[in-house]
Amino acid sequence: MSVPHLRLGVNIDHVATVRNARGGEYPDPIRAAKIAEQAGADGITAHLREDRRHITDADIDGLMAALSVPLNFEMAATDEMQKIALRHKPHAVCIVPEKREERTTEGGLEVAREENRLAHFIAPLREVGCRVSIFIAADRRQVEAAHRIGAQVIELHTGAYCDAHAEGDFATRDRELEALREMSAFAHSLGLEVHAGHGLTYDTVQPVAAFPEVMELNIGHFLIGEAIFRGLHPAIAEMRRLMDEARA
């Protein structure tokens, strides 16, 4: 049986982080998105946080106008963000947890605690044609809850796996990888499309990319950092190559 093409979503948030460190127009996240397309990205991910610390409303406007690949719009489950998503109608909306004090998204959404609210929150997004994804830990209870609320997609948080690898804690790394494998298969059995991301690097991407149920990986911070040394196009192209190699 042939394994489906594994999509690469390139997150451009931290191009905006560099821009906002000084202000002004450069580097331009939209230019980065166009380069990502040329380098093999199948989609672009951008997280409009409530505090606008990196991506801005104007960036979302520009991305919607400029992209020839789908936009995956990451956002918190707030009324403000829902209104923005309903106005733009991006291809995909990924609901993520958000805390003002965090540097980056620290964990998965606790769907099981907020099933009723989240079910009502995502319904209008689905009605206008957005594919709704929920960013969760590799936990059976959260996968089941995401399915019950009507999400079409889950994105599994790979951060614990990547952190354990970076720290040299290979027992934990292998345990986290097995949890990702099991929950990918379980979610797929429920009819959910499976994505994964957070903290993936050249060293950690291939074991996750090899899971046949995973249809998309969203990768950002590492690629933007690697671009300093080898350029954005080559950095993304190498990630694309590693993903394809793992899937072969």
From Swiss-Prot:
Site (Transition state stabilizer): 155
GO BP, sorted A to Z: pyridoxine biosynthetic process
Residues that coordinate or bind 1-deoxy-D-xylulose 5-phosphate: 13-14, 49, 54, 104
Example of a GO cellular component annotation carried by this entry: cytosol
Gene3D superfamilies: Aldolase class I
Catalysed conversion reaction: 3-amino-2-oxopropyl phosphate + 1-deoxy-D-xylulose 5-phosphate = pyridoxine 5'-phosphate + phosphate + 2 H2O + H(+)
Keyword terms: Cytoplasm, Pyridoxine biosynthesis, Transferase
GO molecular function: pyridoxine 5'-phosphate synthase activity
Superkingdom per UniProt: Bacteria
Record: active site: 47, 74, 198
Top-level EC class as recorded in UniProt: transferase
UniProt-listed Pfam families: PdxJ
Protein function: Catalyzes the complicated ring closure reaction between the two acyclic compounds 1-deoxy-D-xylulose-5-phosphate (DXP) and 3-amino-2-oxopropyl phosphate (1-amino-acetone-3-phosphate or AAP) to form pyridoxine 5'-phosphate (PNP) and inorganic phosphate.
PANTHER family documented for this protein: PYRIDOXINE 5'-PHOSPHATE SYNTHASE
Subunit structure: Homooctamer; tetramer of dimers.
Stated name of the protein: Pyridoxine 5'-phosphate synthase
Protein species of origin: Ruegeria pomeroyi (strain ATCC 700808 / DSM 15171 / DSS-3)
Taxonomic path: Bacteria, Pseudomonadati, Pseudomonadota, Alphaproteobacteria, Rhodobacterales
